[in-house]
């Protein structure tokens, strides 16, 4: 089924706690994850909370990647939303699983903007005239 985008919602468990609490490492990893997908990076913003935890977003031309960490639990919540046929969010997922040293994951993929539900013909390209 064709769609405008794919949204991967990932729960990373039993991660490296030091990495999860390092804002520089998380930002670098999220940017690298974006590049792994083949996306074009637009901007990013990351914040370290006190006493611990990091939240951040990488905005890409094709949508966004976000992360929220709870180092005290070894847990990270990650959203990987990409649009178009030229990027693969699963590459970002695999990269982050390795970098965060996650021992266990729960992940679902949700198709966003399904062609049949919007009324777009299956053979239409992603980019059309407005």
UniProtKB/Swiss-Prot annotation:
> Looking at the keywords, is Protein biosynthesis present?
no
A Pfam family that the UniProt record links to this protein: AdoMet_dc
Q: In which pathway does it act?
A: Amine and polyamine biosynthesis; S-adenosylmethioninamine biosynthesis; S-adenosylmethioninamine from S-adenosyl-L-methionine: step 1/1
EC id: 4.1.1.50
Catalyzed reaction equations? S-adenosyl-L-methionine + H(+) = S-adenosyl 3-(methylsulfanyl)propylamine + CO2
Q: What does the record note about the cofactor?
A: Binds 1 pyruvoyl group covalently per subunit.
- What is the designated name of this protein? S-adenosylmethionine decarboxylase proenzyme
Q: Which organism is it from?
A: Thermosipho melanesiensis (strain DSM 12029 / CIP 104789 / BI429)
């Amino acid at each position: 089924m064709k769609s405008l985008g794919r949204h991967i919602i990932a729960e990373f468990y039993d991660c490296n706690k030091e990495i999860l609490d390092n804002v520089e490492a998380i930002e670098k990893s999220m940017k690298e994850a974006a590049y792994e997908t083949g996306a074009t990076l637009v901007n990013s913003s990351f914040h370290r909370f006190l006493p611990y935890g990091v939240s951040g977003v990488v905005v890409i031309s094709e949508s966004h990647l976000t992360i929220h960490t709870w180092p005290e639990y070894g847990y990270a919540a990650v959203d990987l939303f990409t649009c178009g046929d030229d990027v693969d969010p699963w590459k970002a997922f695999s990269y982050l699983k390795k970098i965060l040293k996650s021992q266990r994951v729960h992940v679902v993929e949700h198709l966003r903007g399904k062609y049949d539900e919007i009324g777009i013909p299956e053979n239409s390209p992603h980019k059309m005239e407005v």
